[in-house]
Amino acid sequence: MDLETFRKLASDRRVIPVTRKLLADGDTPVALYRKLAAERPGTFLLESAENGRSWSRYSFVGVRSAATLTARDGQAHWLGAPPVGVPVDGDPLAALRATIEALHTPHQEGMPPFTGGMVGYLGYDIVRRLEKIGPGERDDLGLPELTMLLTSDLAVMDHWQGSVLLIANAINHNDLDTGVDEAYADAVGRLDAMEADLSRAVAQPPAVLPPSELPEYTALWGGPDFQEAVEDIKERIRAGEAFQVVPSQRFETPCTASALDVYRVLRATNPSPYMYLFRFDGFDVVGSSPEALVKVEDGHAMVHPIAGTRHRGATPQEDQALADELLADPKERAEHLMLVDLGRNDLGRVCEPGSVEVVDFMSVERYSHVMHIVSTVTGKVAAGRTAFDVLTACFPAGTLSGAPKPRAMQIIDELEPSRRGLYGGCVGYLDFAGDSDTAIAIRTALLRKGTAYVQAGAGIVADSDPLAEDQECRNKAAAVLRAVHTANRLGK
C-alpha cells in the first residue's frame, strides 16, 4: 500500500492495515512467534488443525498490542491508551462492544480472515452481567472477567503459499483527521522492524520429547464430593428444575515450563481446531479446544455443539467399536440432541427467522485421548445485529452449562466451590471488520506463579452414573495435564 492509497482510506476509517508479504517456507508458526513476539506479554499465537489432523491454511502471530482491555474490581480497566471515544470504566462488556464499534473497518479484498481486532478471552463468570445466576462470591483465582488485546501488529502465515503477511495496523486513536502521513510512516517503520526480526537467528535446540505421563495433581473438588454433587443434580433434574447440568472440577499441577513449551507439547500431542497461546500481564493461557462457541463470518453464524464422549481405543477395531457404542448410547444421543436444540434456540435469538438449520448432525470426531459426537448449526445474522450480539446470545455454551441455561447456571453456582474463571468461557477474537471466531475455553491451562490450572466438566442427566461422570472429567483434563508434565521435562 502506498501513501496515496493510505490517505484515501484514512478519510473514512480509523484502522488501516499496512502489509508486506514475505516468503516463509522455512519457518514454522512457533519459530515466527519466537522471532517476532519473543514471548512478550501482550502477544499470542493462534493455530488450527481440522478434526485434530490436517493443519488449516492460516496461523496468526500477535506481535504487538496497542492496549489491553481487562477488568479490575468489576470495572473496565485499560492497560495502555485506549482509543478516544470508548469507555475507560464501567461494564467491561460495554467497553468491548464500544471499542469494536468505534474501530469498525470494512474487510479488504484478498486479505486473510483476521487482520486485527480484540483478541483474548471472556471468562465464564462474565455471564453474571447477562443473566441472574447468583453472586459467585467464592473466587480463589481472582482472574479478570475478561482480557482482550487491541492487536496492532501481527503476522499471518499462509501454509498453502509458504508465505507470511506482516500487518501493521495504523489505528487512529484520537479520531482526528491530522497526522495521516505520520501514521503511515509509523506503520511502515513497524513493518521494517518485524522484517528485521524475521531475519535474525533464534536458537531452538532440539528437545528430547519424554514419554507422556499423567503427573501428580490435586483436584479442587473431585472424588466423593463431586459424586455427591452429581446425585444432588440428579434429584433436581427429577424434580423438574433442569434437563441437564454440567458441573466441573479443577485440577492443579506444578508448572516449571514456559507457556511456549507447554503449547509446543500440546499442539504436538493434542492438535485441535482451536489452539492458542496467550501471554497476558501476570498469567498465561494455553489451550487446544475442540469446540467452537460461535463463529460469525460475512453475516452468517455457526455453532458446533459437542456432547457425548468416549476414550480412544487401543486399536482401530476397538476405536470403531467405541464410536459405534457412543452413537448407539441413548443417554449420549439424548444429551446431544438437547444441546443441538439449545444451539438452535441461541442462534434463533439473533438470526433471521427461518434461517437457522442443522447442517451436520451427530458425526464422530476423534482427538488424541477422546472422541465426541458433534453437530453444526448455522443461521443468517439478522439486520441490526452484530457479531458481539451473536456472541453474547450464545454465551456461555450449553455444553458447559446445561439446559435450560439460566437454571443450570444457578445450580452450578450453588454447588461448585469457586468461580470458574476462564473455564467454560471463550477464547478468540472480534475483528475490526465485524466478524468473530471464538472457541469454548476447554482443554485449556491457566499458567500462573508455577502452577497450571486445568478444569473439566461432565453433562449430568437423570440417569448419570456419578463415578463415570467423575472419571469423564479426569479423562478430559488428561491431555492438558500430560502436556504440562511433559513440558516440565523437555530436554531433561
PLM segments and residue spans:
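Extended alpha-helical targeting/anchoring segments
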Residues: M1-K492
